[in-house]
């Protein structure tokens, strides 16, 4: 599903900002994308504090969507993220941190 959404984001990147939320956000640039990610991150935190599972799922989905927009804007692929996760799989977070 992530790849499908990412592919649509890449497609919408070329749409008119008047006709696409993704295109309009990308047209506004990095600061607008990052601001939206910050807003969505805060909403995830509030939903988690409220311990409302349905709200958390909704807000996490919004955050992931906006992270995918950032990835499309920066030309970071799903495969790039997958490869990074594969490198980290099987080692503790502390080991991974030391290797950075």
Positions of PLM-derived features:
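Flexible "arm" and connector segments at domain edges
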Residues: 1-60, 64-100
């Amino acid at each position: 599903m992530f790849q499908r959404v990412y592919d649509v984001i890449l497609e919408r990147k070329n749409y008119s900002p008047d006709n696409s939320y993704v295109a309009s956000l990308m047209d506004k640039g990095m600061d607008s994308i990052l601001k939206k990610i910050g807003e969505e991150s805060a909403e995830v935190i509030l939903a988690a504090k409220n311990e409302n599972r349905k709200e958390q799922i909704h807000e996490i989905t919004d955050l992931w969507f906006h992270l995918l927009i950032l990835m499309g804007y920066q030309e970071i692929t799903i495969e790039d993220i997958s490869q990074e996760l594969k490198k980290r799989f099987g080692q503790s977070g502390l080991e991974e941190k030391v290797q950075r």
